[in-house]
């Protein structure tokens, strides 16, 4: 293996780190859209947070693992104002400072529809004691931890759920056995679908659904649509591709192609 190829297996030097964790932030899609930038990774983050917000029922206690700059909060204020509580965990003081700034702006717009707490902690270490949560978000963050620490964090997330509670977990989909080259070198370890399912089940959860949230190349989308739904779905996709901006179509079409999608959203449940 050449030195250049070997580099692809390691987190890029200069990536913001705290110990073994990458604290590189996910795209701030709100800021990007405000200046006219619409790219699939930003729209992916918007979509996955909107999926969660629209599914939060009244009175739900919500935990955001590795909450970063608090990107889930605007959609929760807008679409789920009747949740009972939000708690955000993150290892980075800088990330939490951004989240608090965002919350201040949201409170000016929406008031205080639900209490919000931010807690600085290492999510792979023992967590503070909380009452059980009905919803746990763990979006686009697992890949920022080494594998074994990620397994521990998933066990803690599973233990934090009330019976019947739901974990929304998203992470890039890696293919083949480890060691694997990183798709994004701000990450530490990228998981295969099988590794995620194994760790989630070991945490006492069942996987109810898996959807793509970031697409492969269009020819791979076409191939999986044909396998799943037949030639009519391919014609439909191509018809949309001729009309719909790619960033929007990529985000939506990825939901239907989880076998080839480059990022997945797992919907996992603690049995009642």
Q: Model-derived features: where do they sit?
A:
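Short, glycine-/aromatic-enriched active-site segment of Class I SAM-dependent methyltransferases
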Residues: 169-188
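A short glycine-rich, Lys/Arg-flanked "PGG" loop and its adjoining helix->strand segment in the class I
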Residues: 151-163
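N-terminal, positively charged/glycine-rich alpha-helical extensions of SAM-dependent methyltransferases
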Residues: 1-32
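Class I SAM-dependent methyltransferase SAM/SAH-binding core
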Residues: 71, 75-124
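Conserved alpha-helix/loop element of class I SAM-dependent methyltransferases that forms part
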Residues: 42-58, 75
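A conserved beta-strand element that flanks and buttresses the S-adenosyl-L-methionine
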Residues: 137
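Short alpha-helix
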Residues: 189-204
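A C-terminal cap/extension of S-adenosyl-L-methionine-dependent methyltransferases
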Residues: 168, 212-272
């Amino acid at each position: 293996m050449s030195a250049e190829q070997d580099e692809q297996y390691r987190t890029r030097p200069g990536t913001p780190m705290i110990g073994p964790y990458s604290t590189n932030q996910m795209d701030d899609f709100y800021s990007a859209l405000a200046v006219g930038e619409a790219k699939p990774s930003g729209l992916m983050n918007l979509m996955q947070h909107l999926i969660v917000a629209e599914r939060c029922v009244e009175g739900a206690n919500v935990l955001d693992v590795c909450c970063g700059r608090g990107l889930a909060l605007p959609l929760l204020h807008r679409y789920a104002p009747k949740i009972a509580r939000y708690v955000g965990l993150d290892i980075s003081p800088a990330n939490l400072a951004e989240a608090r700034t965002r919350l201040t702006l949201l409170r000016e717009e929406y008031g205080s529809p639900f209490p919000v707490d931010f807690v600085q902690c290492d999510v792979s270490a023992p967590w503070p004691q909380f009452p059980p949560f009905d919803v746990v978000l763990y979006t686009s963050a697992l890949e920022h931890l080494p594998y074994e620490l990620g397994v521990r964090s998933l066990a803690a997330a599973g233990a934090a759920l009330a019976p019947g509670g739901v974990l929304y977990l998203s992470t890039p989909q890696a293919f083949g056995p480890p060691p694997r080259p990183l798709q994004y070198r701000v990450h530490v370890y990228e998981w295969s679908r099988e590794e995620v399912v194994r760790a989630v089940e070991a945490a006492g959860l069942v996987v109810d659904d898996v959807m793509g949230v970031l697409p492969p190349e269009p020819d791979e989308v076409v191939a999986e649509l044909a396998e799943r739904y037949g030639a009519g779905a391919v014609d439909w996709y191509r018809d949309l591709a001729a009309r719909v901006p790619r960033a929007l179509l990529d985000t939506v079409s990825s939901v239907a192609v989880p076998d080839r999608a480059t990022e997945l959203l797992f919907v996992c449940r603690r049995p009642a």
